[in-house]
Swiss-Prot record:
HAMAP family: 16SrRNA_methyltr_H. Specifically methylates the N4 position of cytidine in position 1402 (C1402) of 16S rRNA. S-adenosyl-L-methionine binds at G35, G36, H37, D55, F80, D102, Q109. This is Ribosomal RNA small subunit methyltransferase H. It is found in: Cytoplasm. InterPro entries: RsmH, SAM-dep_MeTrfase_MraW_recog, SAM-dependent_MTases_sf. It catalyses: cytidine(1402) in 16S rRNA + S-adenosyl-L-methionine = N(4)-methylcytidine(1402) in 16S rRNA + S-adenosyl-L-homocysteine + H(+). One of its GO terms (biological process) is rRNA base methylation. Keywords: Cytoplasm, Methyltransferase, rRNA processing, S-adenosyl-L-methionine, Transferase.
Length: 312
């Protein structure tokens, strides 16, 4: 692996502290990436400890070969939303001491032009976390209706010029297939009338299409629900997210599972409402990277770490 494609795991110390690793514990890293967090977990496990990793990216699976000789380690090539399935196959339901989810695109994925995630590097417009399955971004843009493109860019990218961009996509694709990241970045640049001097005009559009192509928000929701069933009482759920849509889902999930539904005041309550089945306890407040970490690794700037503990 070249230095260009190396990945610096964010909030490393904070994440390891949050997992409260026991030497003989069982842990799951739902987003192995290049193994930064997994390596630190393994370093703290004793001979009886166990780490089950997951990743859908074939390059991540290849990277995991460095741990192939460690009997405490195993990895499954699948989406992290399949957390429950992996745990079930390995007889881990209700036995796991800690689950880590480091959500979003990794530095190697961004830095490799051939993956099609970055508007800063020209390459094929792919954006799939697992390029062996599903539709690429180019295939979707070639077929999608105006309203669908508008909806994705506005909702998942929080881009106020979503409709303008969608119209531009349809205008361009009538005479030229949109197959590269540069083509998409250039047409977004043309479509956006007001530029943010601190942010590339294509930032939100690329984010939106990537999230849509990989069903990222649905992935998070499914994985969070699965984590409750997989964790043992006292087990930790540790989630790192990188933008507001992801963090909102995590925050609201932990809040609901730790506080229950908001009940109406002044009305008689049913037994079910009174005895809500709370499954998690929030641990501390959201953690953000230090100024020193942001200086070392600017991509960590938007990261947020949230911690919850499984109730018994």
């Amino acid at each position: 692996m070249t230095a260009q494609f190396e990945h610096v795991s964010v909030l490393m110390d904070e994440t390891i502290d949050a997992l409260a690793i026991k030497p003989d514990g069982i842990y799951m890293d739902g987003t192995f990436g290049r193994g930064g967090h997994s390596g630190q977990i393994l370093a703290r496990l004793g001979s009886e400890g166990r780490l089950q990793a997951i990743d859908q990216d074939p390059q991540a699976i290849k990277s995991a070969e460095k741990f192939a000789d460690d009997p405490r380690f195993a990895i499954a090539h699948t989406r992290f939303s399949n957390l429950y399935g992996v745990a079930e196959q390995n007889d881990l339901i209700g036995k796991v001491d800690g689950i880590l989810l480091d959500i979003g695109v990794s530095s190697p994925q961004l830095d490799d032009a051939l993956r099609g995630f970055s508007f800063m590097k020209d390459g094929p417009l792919d954006m799939r976390m697992d390029p062996t399955t599903g539709r690429s971004a180019a295939q979707w843009l070639a077929e999608a209706e105006l309203d669908d493109i508008t909806h994705v860019i506005k909702k998942l990218g929080e881009e106020k010029f979503g409709k303008r961009i969608a119209h531009k996509v349809l205008e361009v694709r009538e005479h030229t297939p949109i197959t590269t990241t540069k083509q998409l970045a250039d047409l977004v640049d043309e479509a956006v009338p007001v530029k943010d001097k601190f942010k590339h005009p294509a930032t939100r559009t690329f984010q939106a299409i990537r999230i849509y192509i990989n069903s990222e928000l649905e992935e998070i929701q499914t994985a969070l629900q699965s984590a409750i069933k997989v964790l043992k009482p006292g087990g930790r759920l540790v989630v790192i997210s990188f933008h507001s849509l992801e963090d909102r889902i995590v925050k609201q999930f932990i809040r609901k599972q730790s506080r229950g539904e908001t009940l109406p005041r002044g009305l008689p309550l049913t037994d079910a409402q009174i005895n809500q089945n709370l499954t998690l306890k929030a641990v501390g407040k959201a953690i953000k990277p230090s100024a020193a970490e942001v200086e070392r690794n600017p991509r960590s700037r938007s990261s947020v770490l949230r911690i919850a503990q499984r109730l018994g």
